[in-house]
């Protein structure tokens, strides 16, 4: 499965490629590895789907931008400029691994202190909206970009694309099962369903 800059893990570990970049790569164009070298397929593919993590889709990239609304949250300062060119090197791996571990276990799941936001989350049965770190517009904008990129690059009979995302829930011992949710047409929801909504894939 394929991740872009919108997946929390991919962005933390240096991925800056967009969904458009991913589709161009699948069709045979070179793409830049986070460490600066080019990668290219030996043969173009016939079909492809960008399957970014539904959970926190687009959020880590937003935290890294100090000018964005999510980037102004207190914990986000550690992420500012994370994937600026001067920081894309092996010297930042330890920092990235630490950020990955701390974000997943603490900041991203802290409940919001805004009572109106919490009420809205409860009334709409929208769990993710009730967390302090979540910004609906950022999340939906990333998903919209993924869906629109799939539509732009879809050329049936030559190169087939699918709107898709990854749903992964953790089990005992932090084991997990990756599920790629793939839509058969352009009728996708306004935002993907993730483990933050429910750990039950059914």
Model-derived features with residue positions:
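Extended, charged catalytic domains and RNA/DNA-binding interfaces, predominantly
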Residues: 1-202
